[in-house]
Curated annotation (Swiss-Prot):
One annotated GO biological process: hemolysis in another organism
Origin organism lineage: Bacteria, Pseudomonadati, Pseudomonadota, Gammaproteobacteria, Enterobacterales
Source organism per UniProt: Shigella flexneri
Protein name: Putative hemolysin E-like protein
Assigned protein family: Belongs to the hemolysin E family.
Domain of life from the UniProt record: Bacteria
Length: 113
């Protein structure tokens, strides 16, 4: 009976790992399509290219816009890094959890601790 429960638990955890892996792939594909990084970089370059032609007021505004664009890119990469770190930790923990059931047997379970 206990072995059946262990097998079922291992299956649930394996499904969770596969689901998390699929979600991470979807996350990457979706964001790569939503955020046009090439256009993003080209916009920053174009704003810089014409900096000599801006008025004083316009140069302040364009500077603020460039700062916001670059800050948003930094925040995106920080958030993405956090997602990858959590996935890495979760994957290791779930793999260790599965090992507990792969090495499970009745003698070990009933042995005094």
């Amino acid at each position: 009976m206990t072995e059946i429960v262990a097998d079922k638990t291992v299956e649930v955890v394996k499904n969770a790992i596969e689901t998390a892996d699929g979600a991470l792939d979807l996350y990457n594909k979706y964001l790569d399509q939503v955020i046009p990084w090439q256009t993003f970089d080209e916009t920053i370059k174009e704003l810089s290219r014409f900096k000599q032609e801006y008025s004083q007021a316009a140069s302040v505004l364009v500077g603020d816009i460039k700062t916001l664009l670059m800050d948003s890119q930094d925040k995106y990469f920080e958030a993405t890094q956090t997602v990858y770190e959590w996935c890495g930790v979760a994957t290791q923990l779930l793999a260790a959890y599965i090992l507990l059931f792969d090495e499970y047997n009745e003698k070990k379970a009933s042995a005094p601790h």
